[in-house]
UniProtKB/Swiss-Prot annotation:
Protein name in UniProt: Nucleoprotein
Subunit and partners: Homomultimerizes to form the nucleocapsid. Binds to viral genomic RNA. In nucleocapsid, binds protein P and thereby positions the polymerase on the template. Protein P acts as a chaperone on free protein N to prevent it from aggregation before encapsidating genomic RNA.
Major location category of this protein: virion
Impact when changing residue 10 to A: In strain: RC-HL
Species this chain originates from: Rabies virus (strain Nishigahara RCEH)
Length: 450
């Protein structure tokens, strides 16, 4: 008997076939750099920086920016942001800089130039006759890069959220060490005229480069990161959610994964922790691999690890976390099953902690405490054999650990308990549910059962 086949009758004929579907329609690409060459882009001919500044500022005031000119200017302006490398900096085998080296954002990547002249029009008229200062260049760079952040804010954020962010960014870039170079609301007006900056590959590359530089190098103008910070771990919401989850429940990654009782986690965990990736290396190219063009389809997105993502946010919902209630359910990744496991794990980690004394008045008190704890442990280990203490723990409902939780799930036939459902309904019904969010899913799925 072939376990993969099914047998049925069609038009009086017995048919045997293997039902096969495409399980994963995407080919995920890992961001490892195989050729030991820094990430690279090609731009037009390097401009005269003073002329470029006046042209781009004029375009911003007129809400008519030329993306090619903007990218050419941002690359040329990197020379203004020199800093000192604090340690030897390597990533994927590439030496970026030695400790003590003077570096600019340009040191992290390779920017090639061709002979194509920029446009450099003065679309907003000629207002500035003198040459700009470094502070003015820094302010313009900061405002331009902030268009990336604004274009990444999704339509789910209602009201004046985006306008408020734009206003706060403008305030940053008119306060020392920056200087005011545009009128109020210019940034939002410019964004509205071209809202898709985050989809322009060269602009995205430059935003990621600036962010990678300022995240490591202490600099007078480090606040430029306010517009680029969204390039860090971009399209890695699955991995980022997992990292936040283990911090939230105070376990290591290894300890947390022991609670993932479902076969669909296997491929996702393997994908998330692919050997050779610098997922745990500070200041690696990995952190900005999407913006630097090192991967087409991220293996770390919420869709790539949808079961892990769903489970983590169901646990978050159980704990009443707004971020989880607002997150979007990955509908194709067993949300009903993940909500069951999420209920049990939520119960396991919510409202209970592991506590012990760690601080003492003096060394004598510390030694007395340690001696008393050793005695307690010895007594606990002296099992007289009359009770199978493991089984007793499983069925008492008080034991902690993967085995105890798994036993509780099995005892209840893989179904949620009434207390779990009440908790889910309580947290989701008190929340303004967004479409397709975890809050909406829990409300629709369990409100009639409570």
């Amino acid at each position: 008997m072939d376990a993969d086949r099914i047998v049925f009758r069609s038009n009086n004929q017995v048919v045997s076939l293997r039902p096969e579907i495409i399980a994963d329609q995407y080919e995920y690409k890992y961001p490892a750099i195989k050729d030991l060459k820094k990430p690279c882009i090609t731009l037009g001919k390097a401009p005269d920086l003073n002329k470029a500044y006046k042209s781009v500022l004029s375009g911003m005031n007129a809400a008519k920016l030329d993306p090619d000119d903007v990218c050419s200017y941002l690359a040329a302006a990197m020379q203004f942001f020199e800093g000192t490398c604090p340690e030897d900096w390597t990533s994927y085998g590439i030496l970026i800089a030695r400790k003590g080296d003077k570096i600019t954002p340009n040191s992290l990547v390779e920017i090639k130039r061709n002979d194509v002249e920029g446009n450099w029009a003065l679309t907003g008229g000629m207002e500035m006759t003198r040459d700009p200062t470094v502070s003015e260049h820094a302010s313009l760079v900061g405002l331009l890069l902030s268009l990336y952040r604004l274009s990444k804010i999704s339509g789910q954020n209602t009201g004046n959220y985006k306008t408020n962010i734009a206003d706060r960014i403008e305030q940053i870039f008119e306060t020392a060490p920056f200087v005011k170079i545009v009128e109020h609301h210019t940034l939002m007006t410019t964004h509205k005229m071209c809202a898709n900056w985050s989809t322009i590959p060269n602009f995205r590359f430059l935003a990621g480069t600036y962010d990678m530089f300022f995240s490591r190098i202490e600099h007078l103008y480090s606040a430029i990161r306010v517009g680029t910070v969204v390039t860090a771990y971009e399209d890695c919401s699955g991995l980022v959610s997992f990292t936040g989850f283990i911090k939230q429940i105070n376990l290591t990654a290894r300890e947390a994964i022991l609670y993932f009782f479902h076969k669909n986690f296997e491929e996702e965990i393997r994908r998330m922790f692919e050997p050779g990736q610098e997922t745990a290396v500070p200041h690696s190219y990995f952190i900005h691999f999407r913006s630097l063009g090192l991967s087409g389809k991220s293996p770390y997105s919420s869709n790539a690890v949808g079961h892990v993502f769903n489970l983590i946010h169901f646990v978050g919902c159980y704990m009443g976390q707004i971020r989880s209630l607002n997150a979007t359910v990955i509908a194709a990744c067993a949300p009903h099953e993940m909500s069951v496991l999420g209920g049990y794990l939520g119960e396991e980690f919510f409202g209970r902690g592991t506590f012990e004394r760690r601080f003492f008045r003096d060394e004598k008190e510390l030694q007395e405490y340690e001696a008393a704890e050793l005695t307690k442990t010895d007594v606990a280990l002296a099992d007289d054999g009359t009770v199978d203490s493991d089984d007793e723990d499983y069925f008492s409902g008080e034991a902690r650990g993967p085995e105890a939780v798994y036993a509780r799930i099995m005892m209840n036939g893989g179904r949620l308990k009434r207390s779990h459902i009440r908790r889910y309904v309580s947290v989701s019904s008190n929340h303004q549910a967004r479409p397709n969010s975890f809050a909406e899913f829990l409300n629709k799925t369990y409100s009639s059962d409570s």
